[in-house]
A protein has these predicted regions:
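Signature for the C-terminal beta-barrel architecture of outer-membrane proteins
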Residues: 3-195
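Flexible glycine-rich, low-complexity coil/linker segments exposed to the extracellular/periplasmic environment
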Residues: 193-208
C-alpha cells in the first residue's frame, strides 16, 4: 500500500545479500540477509561479540490473474551493543523503532542478554481483478526481545511487540483515482515496565 513501516521506504542501507528464484510462472521466492549494524563497539584491535545486528528473511510473491499476494517472514539476532555501540539516545531512529519507551542506552547495556532476538511476519495483497476497482492489504506482526533490565529498582522488560494492518480501496477514473485508506495498529498499555505493545521497526519510515 505504501512504504514499509519495518524496513522503511528505501532509505535504509546496509550490507546484505539477496537470492531470488522463480519456481513457476506464478510463484517465486527471495531469500535475503541484512547486516543492519556492525562493529559499533570496541576498536580495530578489540573484537566485540555483541555489536552487530543481523536479519534473515524470506518473501514468496505469488501472482495470478488480477491478484498478487506476498507472504513474508524475517528473523534477527541483535547484539546489545549494536545500537551505536551502546552510546545512543532516543533520537536515534533505530532505537525509536525497536525499543520500548524509556529504553535508554543504560537500560540496554544492563540487560541480562548479550544478544536479543527479533522476528517479523506479514502479508501484502493487491486485488485488481474487479478493475476499475482496486483493493490492497498490508499486515504485519513483529517482536523484539532484548531481555530484562532494571529501572527505578524494578524489573524492566526490554521488549517490544505489536502489529498493524492497512486496507486500501480505490476506483480508477479517467482523470483521477479516488480511494479510501484504513489502518490500525496495536498500542502501548498503561504499564511502562512490561515492554512496548507497538510494532517494532528496524528503519521506520512510517511510525505505527
Amino acid at each position: 500500500i505504501s512504504n514499509n513501516p519495518i524496513l522503511g521506504g528505501g532509505s535504509a542501507d546496509g550490507a546484505g545479500l539477496t537470492i531470488s528464484s522463480q519456481f513457476t510462472e506464478n510463484v517465486g521466492a527471495s531469500l535475503f540477509w541484512l547486516r543492519a549494524e556492525n562493529d559499533n563497539a570496541g576498536s580495530n584491535s578489540v573484537k566485540q561479540y555483541s555489536d552487530a545486528m543481523d536479519f534473515v528473511g524470506l518473501t514468496v510473491p505469488m501472482t495470478f490473474d488480477g491478484v498478487k499476494v506476498t507472504p513474508w517472514g524475517m528473523g534477527g539476532i541483535i547484539g546489545h551493543d549494536s545500537f551505536k555501540g551502546g552510546n545512543f539516545d532516543l533520537n536515534y531512529p533505530m532505537a525509536q523503532g525497536m525499543l520500548p519507551l524509556m529504553g535508554t542506552s543504560t537500560i540496554v547495556a544492563n540487560s541480562d542478554k548479550d544478544h536479543g532476538s527479533a522476528w517479523f511476519g506479514g502479508v501484502s495483497a493487491d486485488l485488481s481483478y474487479f478493475d476499475p476497482f482496486r483493493f490492497a492489504l498490508d499486515a504485519a506482526y513483529g517482536s523484539v526481545d532484548l531481555g530484562t533490565s532494571k529501572l527505578n529498582g524494578k524489573n524492566f522488560d526490554v521488549k517490544r511487540s505489536g502489529w498493524y494492518a492497512a486496507l486500501l480501496a480505490e476506483y480508477k477514473l479517467e482523470s483521477c483515482t479516488p480511494g479510501l485508506l484504513f489502518w490500525y495498529s496495536s498500542g502501548d498499555d498503561a504499564n511502562a515496565y512490561n515492554g512496548s505493545e507497538r510494532l517494532p521497526s528496524i528503519d521506520p519510515d512510517v511510525y505505527v
